[in-house]
Amino acid sequence: MPILTESLTEKKPLAGNNEINQLAFVVHDIEKTSELFAKLLGIPKPAWFLTGDSEVSKVVFRSKPTNSRSKLVFMNTPTVQFELIEPNEEPGTMREFLDTVGEGIHHIAFDVDSIKEKLPIFEENGYPLLQSGEFTSSDGRYVYVDTLKDHKTLIELLESAEPRDTEQSKESYEPLLGTNKVEQLAIVVKDLDAAAEAYCKLLGVEKPQVIQSGPSELTKVVFEGEPTQGDSKYLFINTPLLQIELIEPGKSPSTWKKHLETHGEGVHHISFVIKNMNEKIKLLEEMGYPVIQTGNFYNGKGRYAYMDTTLDFKVIIELLERFDS
């Protein structure tokens, strides 16, 4: 989908800011997955570390102390930070996600000055505390709030005594797609207006314009090898680092409709703006990542391709190419 510019307003975000700084993936094999993500982003493979035991981490899940521990890897990009999480078998939100949903994006994160101040705001808005804990390698703490119903993903609040390390690796290689800048996080929803209201309240912004998919002779959507109208309506919400896209599928076949029918509401893809679309599609197909759907922007100013990268990257990757670039 095309990326639009939408100004932010002065409404107050629930977390005190609207900077989504992290996309966190729960995975079965952090060693293998971190190697794949390092190649995608063009950085050296970082080493994972194990979170502390219960005396250090003090994890409480659904109001009960737990010995939940996880292997973690952090990878910085020009926009958001990727976090990879391999949980142990003890009760915890990541273990629960892996057992019930499978691998994928578990949460988005915001930095806050004080969890003690911000958590009650979320709770007053109907988002209860799900899990809390202390950082292992630095002075800080986190909480997960249960925003799944409204935001289709969980939200983490991070409180750090010192600024977290978000600097990109000084040693870098050519990213797989020619860029490592994540542009979008896209979420498929049943009710666009309701989801938009929830996100705009979370982020402290006015509701953006709803966009209807363009005529099929312009968009030329092909889904799983067959032409389709691929109708939908959607909108874009800009944040400082990442754009949120909310998509409500129409009745005709499309990747969004299939996702909604198969997996329900939730994260559908992340996006990268690239050049030489045909070359990138060929590269990914040769690596074993087939095309799911292609089409043109609703306004005819670019095109997109969804690649089936879920096995390795735990989410669909969308390639975006602007015709004026």
Regions found by a protein language model. Give the residues of each.
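N-terminal beta-strand motif that seeds the catalytic metal site of vicinal oxygen chelate
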Residues: 2-32, 40-42, 103-110, 163-196, ...
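Vicinal oxygen chelate
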Residues: 2-14, 116-178, 236, 272, ...
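Residues within well-ordered alpha-helices
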Residues: 33-34, 71, 118, 195-196, ...
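Conserved active-site tyrosine of GNAT-family acetyltransferases
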Residues: 36-38, 95, 122, 198-200, ...
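Conserved acetyl-CoA-binding loop of GNAT-fold acetyltransferases
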Residues: 40-43, 126-128, 201-206, 287-290
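Conserved short beta-strand elements that form part of the metal-binding/catalytic scaffold
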Residues: 44-96, 141-163, 206-258, 296, ...
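Short consensus segments that form the blades of beta-propeller domains
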Residues: 63, 99, 175-176, 261
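Long, charged/polar, surface-exposed segments that mediate recognition or autoinhibition
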Residues: 90-119, 256-282
